[in-house]
């Protein structure tokens, strides 16, 4: 089934959306005929024939990362709805041009090229899997398109592979590791890391291993999990030895499989278990049930009203998400970090376009300059909190929340301010 035919996408609007209901008409040559009609943009009445900004949104809507890609796209759509409802950007509406990268780098590169050449987008906001983001960065650069990333965490995006055209307005693994390592060492001195065998998992493994060692701990072993492994038992059953902590770095269906099978093997009771927050995102919780109990994680966003997340603007944004998704997702899950980061990324892009007087690709350099060192504050557009897009590498830093799963809910143990997670820039723009 194509992503456009799935229930979650029914209430979204994107360029080229078709009403697939069949309309009947009469013809002298043929009897009743079926037809499909383009769904008009919801902003047409307000903006008339004003030329919209075309913003590309490349996400994994099928394949291994599809569940996360859907949440990411919902975050972008939520921001675009609010932008258009409040007058657009520079008096022009925003039109989303959505493409599915199928969770594969080669497909992502082809779709990025299509967005750049066929669809002629003005800017791009999206990207979920790090290997896809890395594969597409040269496309955006070659066509002079600003790329505001929504999810990808691989450190190379803003370090050794950085680009003047790409921005990451949220955290990355080195910042997470700096924030979490002191707590991990209190839980256990010796750790075994289980990680997804692709760029994000590998780089996150390295970041946490380095920080654990720097704080006097030790990583005594690692277990590599190929993406899409349905039965991890043969791999997990080999885990043993002298260590006290089990650390997981997985996402999507693999995160669910890991948590369930590690629990069933007794690993999560034998060892203190912790991990990257993607294991315990809200969409995973219904399937994990009680088996996620006691998990300690770190994330930039949690769907709770605690600590600095207990604000009127977070509650308002949370309610807007629930209202937007309740028709297509009965028993709606709460928003997660993928919704949050794409929502805020689109708002970063909006502010940059407004401040630069951006009209289209010819103004890309002006847009880049407006985004560099752009500082934003917590509010309706940035419910997660304050942050700044650093000029030197186009990297932002965010507050980090260390949490424990109790009775199926995230409970914040401590908040680490973004200022305590800052890493020195390691980027040299070409």
Question: Residue spans of the language-model regions?
Answer:
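Extracytoplasmic "Venus flytrap"
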Residues: 56-77, 99-105, 128-129, 196-201, ...
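C-terminal segment of N-terminal export signals and the immediately downstream linker at the start
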Residues: 16-17, 38-64
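Segments of small-molecule ligand-sensing domains
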Residues: 324-339, 350-412, 427
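Extracellular/periplasmic periplasmic-binding protein-like sensory domains
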Residues: 262-343, 356-358, 415-429
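N-terminal secretory signal peptides
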Residues: 1-22, 36
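Beta-alpha junction/loop-to-helix N-cap segments that form part of ligand/metal-binding clefts
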Residues: 67-72, 89-159, 169, 225-232, ...
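Extracellular/periplasmic Venus flytrap/periplasmic-binding protein
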Residues: 110, 155-156, 163-265, 308-315
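Periplasmic-binding protein-like
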Residues: 115, 120-128, 148-150, 192-195, ...
């Amino acid at each position: 089934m194509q992503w456009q035919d799935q229930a979650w996408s029914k209430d979204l609007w994107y360029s080229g959306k078709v009403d697939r209901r069949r309309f009947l008409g009469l013809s002298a040559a043929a009897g009743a005929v079926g037809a499909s009609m383009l769904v008009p943009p919801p902003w047409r009445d307000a903006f008339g024939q004003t030329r919209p900004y075309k913003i590309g949104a490349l996400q994994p809507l099928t394949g291994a990362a599809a569940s996360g890609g859907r949440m990411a796209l919902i975050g972008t759509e939520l921001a675009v709805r609010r932008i258009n409802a409040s007058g657009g950007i520079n008096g022009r509406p925003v039109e989303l041009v959505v493409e599915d990268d199928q969770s594969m780098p080669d497909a992502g590169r082809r779709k990025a090229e299509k967005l750049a050449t066929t669809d002629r987008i003005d800017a791009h906001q999206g990207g979920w899997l790090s290997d896809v983001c890395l594969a597409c960065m040269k496309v955006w650069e070659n066509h002079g398109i600003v790329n505001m990333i929504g999810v990808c965490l691989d450190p190379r995006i803003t370090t050794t592979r950085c680009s003047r055209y790409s921005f990451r307005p949220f955290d990355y693994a080195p910042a997470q590791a700096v924030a979490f390592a002191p707590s991990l060492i209190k839980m256990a001195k010796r750790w075994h890391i289980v990680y997804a065998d692709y760029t994000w998992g590998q780089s996150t493994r390295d970041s946490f291993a380095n920080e654990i060692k720097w704080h006097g701990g030790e990583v005594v072993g690692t277990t590599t999990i190929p993406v899409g492994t349905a039965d991890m038992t043969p791999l997990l059953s080999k885990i043993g030895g002298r260590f006290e902590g089990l650390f997981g770095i997985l996402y999507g269906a693999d995160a669910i499989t890991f948590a369930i099978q590690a629990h069933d093997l007794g690993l999560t009771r034998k060892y203190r278990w912790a991990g990257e927050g993607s294991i315990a995102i809200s969409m995973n919780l219904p399937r994990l049930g009680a088996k996620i109990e006691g998990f300690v994680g770190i994330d930039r966003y949690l769907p709770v009203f605690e600590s600095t997340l207990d604000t009127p603007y977070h509650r308002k944004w949370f309610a807007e998400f629930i209202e937007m998704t309740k028709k297509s997702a009965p028993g709606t899950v709460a928003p997660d970090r993928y919704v949050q980061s794409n929502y805020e990324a689109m708002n970063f892009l909006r502010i940059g376009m407004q401040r630069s007087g951006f009209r289209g690709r010819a103004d890309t350099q002006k847009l880049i300059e407006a985004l560099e060192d752009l500082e934003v504050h917590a509010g309706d557009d940035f419910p997660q909190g304050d942050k700044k897009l650093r000029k030197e590498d186009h990297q932002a830093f965010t507050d980090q929340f260390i949490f424990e799963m109790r009775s199926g809910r995230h409970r914040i143990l401590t908040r680490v301010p973004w200022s305590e997670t800052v890493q020195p820039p390691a980027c040299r723009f070409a």
